[in-house]
Amino acid sequence: MEALVYTFLLVSTLGIIFFAIFFREPPKVPTKKG
């Protein structure tokens, strides 16, 4: 099941990078101000 482990690590790394960029740059989507 090494493939599953490598896949998990790959997804985790991409997830961390994605969130790092996402939170570094404010999302350009209209927010609802309640």
UniProtKB/Swiss-Prot annotation:
Disulfide bonds: none annotated. It is found in: Plastid, Chloroplast thylakoid membrane. It is a single-pass membrane protein. GO terms for biological process: photosynthesis. Keywords: Chloroplast, Membrane, Photosynthesis, Photosystem II, Plastid, Thylakoid, Transmembrane, Transmembrane helix. The chain crosses the membrane at residues 3-23. SUPFAM superfamilies: Photosystem II reaction center protein T, PsbT. Coiled coil: none annotated. The keyword Coiled coil does not apply. InterPro entries: PSII_PsbT, PSII_PsbT_sf. Pfam families: PsbT. GO terms for cellular component: chloroplast thylakoid membrane; photosystem II reaction center. Found at the monomer-monomer interface of the photosystem II (PS II) dimer, plays a role in assembly and dimerization of PSII. PSII is a light-driven water plastoquinone oxidoreductase, using light energy to abstract electrons from H(2)O, generating a proton gradient subsequently used for ATP formation. Belongs to the PsbT family. PSII is composed of 1 copy each of membrane proteins PsbA, PsbB, PsbC, PsbD, PsbE, PsbF, PsbH, PsbI, PsbJ, PsbK, PsbL, PsbM, PsbT, PsbY, PsbZ, Psb30/Ycf12, at least 3 peripheral proteins of the oxygen-evolving complex and a large number of cofactors. It forms dimeric complexes. This is Photosystem II reaction center protein T. It comes from Glycine max (Soybean). The gene is psbT.
